[in-house]
Amino acid sequence: MWNFLAPPAHKQELPAEKIDSAYKSYRWQVFLGIFIGYAGFYIVRKNFSMAIPELAQFGFEKGELSIVLSMNAVAYALSKFLMGSVSDRSNARVFLPLGLVLAAVSMMFMIVPVQFFGPEQKSLAIIVMAVLNFLVGWFNGM
């Protein structure tokens, strides 16, 4: 089931005369992939903190939203610790984008508690947002 995360097959070493030219392009590909990927993770992770002032208009207090925000930090720390060994045994070309897509999808569902639970169900909305933000933090740790 998880074969798509398996590390790629070992490639033969390049001849010595081709190493410099091939590695120049690889350096840029790796740098841009990591830079864009990490920037995407950062934007997804910090998205909720920018929405906190707007959520106050819907009756949420900053103290309640800080609990939701702290779930992200807890999940991120746990995920970095636990998913590190998983990522070492995985294909980084699949693992990083998978984490980014899952984090973005989880963040897109953050509107559901605000839209579908009214002020009378604020505690349920906080719980759903906390679970979703935990998932965002977990996937960001991938």
For each predicted feature, which ranges?
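Helical-face signature of the major facilitator-like transporter fold
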Residues: 34-38, 42, 73, 129-137
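Helix-to-loop junctions at the C-terminal end of transmembrane segments
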Residues: 79-91
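Hydrophobic core of transmembrane alpha-helices in multi-pass small-molecule transporters
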Residues: 120-142
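Residue-level signature of mid-helix packing/kink "hotspots" within the transmembrane helices
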Residues: 46, 73-81
